[in-house]
């Protein structure tokens, strides 16, 4: 089966936001950038700031990743500023729900994104990946992404 990018609907967005807010908070704690007691509130604020109008926030594109009309296997969110000098879009969030991982769907989704991005006039895709997420890093490298900046921290 082939992954389809379909514009996220309101109910899908609500479910996505609940899931991803929690997951992002956990990842920030795991990365050591947020304290556990602050993480949920900070995560909610990040998403409120980035998507003040939800699905209607200009230049943000949120898709459900589907195998067919009803089976949602994941999500993908990009920001594509039309006036960006490099015609670049930033992947804010991308993921598959646990039962669908390791089946090749992530590569299919990124290939579908490449095609959609080209049709939007985008010439470059960028993203952030947590250093501890070796699976994601490997996926991105296998699909043509390269490191451009590295941020490092040291606990004292």
UniProtKB/Swiss-Prot annotation:
CDD domains: NAT_SF. Its EC number is 2.3.1.-. Coiled coil: none annotated. GO terms for molecular function: acyltransferase activity, transferring groups other than amino-acyl groups. Keywords: Acyltransferase, Transferase. Transmembrane segments: none annotated. Residues 11-156 form the N-acetyltransferase domain. It comes from the Bacteria. InterPro entries: Acyl_CoA_acyltransferase, GNAT_dom, N-acetyltransferase_domain. It holds the Pfam family Acetyltransf_1. The keyword Transferase applies. Homodimer. Belongs to the acetyltransferase family. This is Uncharacterized N-acetyltransferase YycN. The lineage of its organism: Bacteria, Bacillati, Bacillota, Bacilli, Bacillales.
């Amino acid at each position: 089966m082939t992954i389809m990018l379909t514009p996220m609907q309101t109910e899908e967005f609500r479910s996505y936001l609940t899931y991803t807010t929690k997951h992002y908070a956990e990842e920030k704690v795991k990365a050591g950038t947020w304290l556990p007691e602050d993480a949920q509130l900070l995560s909610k604020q990040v998403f409120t700031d980035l998507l003040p109008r939800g699905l209607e926030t200009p230049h943000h594109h949120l898709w459900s990743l589907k195998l067919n009309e009803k089976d949602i296997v994941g999500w993908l969110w990009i920001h594509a500023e039309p006036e960006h000098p490099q015609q670049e879009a930033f992947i804010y969030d991308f993921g598959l729900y646990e039962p669908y991982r390791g089946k090749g769907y992530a590569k299919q989704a990124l290939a579908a994104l490449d095609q959609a991005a080209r049709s939007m006039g985008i010439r470059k895709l960028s993203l952030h990946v947590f250093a501890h997420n070796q699976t994601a890093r490997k996926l991105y490298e296998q699909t043509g992404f390269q490191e451009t900046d590295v941020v490092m921290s040291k606990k004292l």
